[in-house]
From Swiss-Prot:
Localization of this protein: Cytoplasm; Nucleus; Cytoplasm, Cytoskeleton, Microtubule organizing center, Centrosome
Designated name of the protein: Heat shock 70 kDa protein 1
Domain commentary: The N-terminal nucleotide binding domain (NBD) (also known as the ATPase domain) is responsible for binding and hydrolyzing ATP. The C-terminal substrate-binding domain (SBD) (also known as peptide-binding domain) binds to the client/substrate proteins. The two domains are allosterically coupled so that, when ATP is bound to the NBD, the SBD binds relatively weakly to clients. When ADP is bound in the NBD, a conformational change enhances the affinity of the SBD for client proteins.
Residues that bear Phosphothreonine: 636
Organism for this UniProt entry: Canis lupus familiaris (Dog)
Recorded name of the encoding gene: HSPA1
Amino acid sequence: MAKSAAIGIDLGTTYSCVGVFQHGKVEIIANDQGNRTTPSYVAFTDTERLIGDAAKNQVALNPQNTVFDAKRLIGRKFGDPVVQSDMKHWPFQVVNDGDKPKVQVSYKGETKAFYPEEISSMVLTKMKEIAEAYLGYPVTNAVITVPAYFNDSQRQATKDAGVIAGLNVLRIINEPTAAAIAYGLDRTGKGERNVLIFDLGGGTFDVSILTIDDGIFEVKATAGDTHLGGEDFDNRLVNHFVEEFKRKHKKDISQNKRAVRRLRTACERAKRTLSSSTQASLEIDSLFEGIDFYTSITRARFEELCSDLFRSTLEPVEKALRDAKLDKAQIHDLVLVGGSTRIPKVQKLLQDFFNGRDLNKSINPDEAVAYGAAVQAAILMGDKSENVQDLLLLDVAPLSLGLETAGGVMTALIKRNSTIPTKQTQIFTTYSDNQPGVLIQVYEGERAMTRDNNLLGRFELSGIPPAPRGVPQIEVTFDIDANGILNVTATDKSTGKANKITITNDKGRLSKEEIERMVQEAEKYKAEDEVQRDRVSAKNALESYAFNMKSAVEDEGLKGKISEADKKKVLDKCQEVISWLDANTLAEKDEFEHKRKELEQVCNPIITGLYQGAGGPGAGGFGAQAPKGGSGSGPTIEEVD
């Protein structure tokens, strides 16, 4: 067998996508529902765990135990203002565990708490399985993408999520960089080009400026808004229709979670329709207190409802241009990424800002990031195809990195947007006479004072020989590797004594043991999911068999061919089984199978005798199909809402 391909995963806030590079091109892989993007949702019920479409589809029925937006929690502390403000909007509960946020849900009748890494790992496991189902062999190697402004601990935590999902994470790369790679393949050999990537997704907005020169990518600047995306546009529509419902029916549905959730689903659908049509209609039966809600909305009205949000997308564009020290006339290409860039008004605003420049939308905006990640995965696996041969990837540090010097001043060694991997060294000295040691405190951020920046870690270099202030020479080196992991070393030049810290943000990070434990738990949950699937198919098989038998003996065409006694025997037994099923929906697989054997012992002799007697064309048809029941015919889908 050829060596297995590596995959690229776009782990999104609201949706995720997976791709693979094979036979010289990228394939974006559809899930079992036929969708090329999968909701980043995980749901827990009394009987099972659902991931992706299945989880999102039942959210109206089970909002407290359906988890999404794990990407907004990952790598953050519980006390982080972002976490505190986001928590107010989520229907699921977030609890504090040693200043780490955990999501608390009820699963199989027990209260369980999961780290964001675990929730994300479940989504990653789903993406891995989607790829495996398509490729037909196990997949372990993957490139996973993160937003450009993710800091060190968020990157690390994402990597941990990959490990828990059983992946070997080849590299974590920036989403815009991935989109640029997707874009760069068809753009080699044109001299240096400045590309602006405008990524408006389901929950977040990112602007990045890259320079591409002969297959080499360099990220010049990044900007964005972590809380702007398709969901905000949905919210505007929801609020609009809640008000309309009040006007029309004098009732407020906003406190009824299920009604709002059904309305939101309809709004999301309407929004998508409005990207291609100028009008969309909503029809929701019995939305609230038995009232059917039938209404419509025009594209113009939708644009007006969201006009301030749409306009606000241009501010980060201006900021990125300033950071990259480029004028808008110097941008050669504009690339659209993220489903929300399909909105005509958003495209028009961007196009007008760049004085009518053409937008590049040849890549499906939902898939561009996974596309690039798949290419990058192929490169890292040593793919020799000429399409990827000449591509080299330079990434950047999203925030300045430095240390605290006298008076709480932030002294940056690695400036924001520096190309990584990179290494910077600077000499520092002591602040007071005979100072025995120095405390090296490492920060990330753009503010002048360290108190306004984010402390990544600290360590001490002790044993400095007594000397007047300003005499000792302490050499500090900041070294970032290709994954954005930071090593800081301090060396006393006189003694050669050194100390170092690797910032994978240990305070915010999971320990090796915790990751191990989570890997095992992930396996356990996966096994439980399998058991649950088998159980359900055994139940369905029994149910179909019972109903098939019942309808067989009640068939008008069999009158006179079966004795009333036999008929009663079969019907009574079927009825007994059907009643037992209603009372024991949660029985185990072998109980269902045992019941089925019991039922077969009663039915088979009668049915076989019946058909041998009848001898008709139907003889084999029914007996052959029935014992299979539901199990052979694939999963059955129950409609929700």
